[in-house]
Amino acid sequence: MGTFSQSRTVSNFKNSNNIYTDADIPKLSKSRFQTGLQCSKALYYACYHPDLADAPSELMTATQKNGDMVGRLAHDMFPGGVLIDEDYYDRNNAMAHTQQAMSENAPAIFEATFMHNNVLVKNDILQNNGDGTYDLIEVKSATSLKNQNITDVAVQLNVLEGAGIKVRNAYLMRLNPKYVYNGGEHDLDQLFVKDDITDIAKKYARVEVKHDLKRMHNVLRNHGREPKCDIGKQCTTPFQCSFYRQCHENLPEHPITELPRLSDKLMTRLQKDNIMAIKDIPEGYGLSEAQEKVRQVVLSNDVKVDPSVKKEFRSLNYPLHFLDFETMQTVVPEYKGTRPYQQIPFQYSLHILHEDGTIEH
């Protein structure tokens, strides 16, 4: 784990009395809240050392672009909606623009911006019900409802209610996995599905979110000190951490994370015993059969081949044919008869291995 100068961090965010207040610490957002739920150390890095983040992968970049595209399509379902188009960091003007749209009774507001309790949120869609209440609609490019969608909506509800906005219903708007594209303009009423998550999201917003925000604010108020968090499943679940490399670059050769089917219980036990390398796991530690095989291979530094594999290969009849094919998928279907995320083959190759070792393509 890298180390950082405490004075560097503190000087950026402390006030004249060297005491942290909500005015001194970084603002939380929807994404930072999700990060804080996953790992306190990741939240610390995101707020104080964002430069340490891994470079975004092609998949992450594509996912972001797909999300933006789906969000724009969702806007088309709310004619007359007003887009709050100020930059994320121009929050004062964004909030003023939001209030203006509300005062003008806009039927829907896209990227409506509110702040409460040092948390800044931008709502995907805030639909005006015409009776002084609003519906909160979170748009996702996924085809199913996930737990993190509930927490995402819940923190927004917490801020909206704290800001005095009356929310009647909360929805997740996602892609319909059964939608089949018939060509021409998309039927948006069929492309999208709305899940009513009002009850569970409001309950979470009024109980768990308050507790979670208090914990996260305490992490950020703690004089900029890096919290202690062991590596674990939170490094990749529910998302690959943006600071994965930072926490894993100094691990020993063949760390315990390479053990197959490593349970939380075993991980905790190993860390408690200060064992981070597979080679340091003592004999009789209670590993599974597969894990013990890995330990033995690491200790012997030799390749082990299961005899049954050789037997299986000897039973094969030549020539052997290997079929390789490539597929593509589009989030929003572009070809008639296809669905969101459907795998569409577009290329194949056949490799033929002869008994004398020659390969034919």
Predicted regions and their residues:
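Conserved RNase H-like, two-metal-ion catalytic cores of nucleic-acid enzymes
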Residues: 114, 308-361
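Active-site ExK catalytic segment of metal-dependent nucleases
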Residues: 111-113, 122-128, 133-145, 152, ...
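Flexible loop/turn segments at secondary-structure boundaries
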Residues: 52, 144-145, 179-180, 250, ...
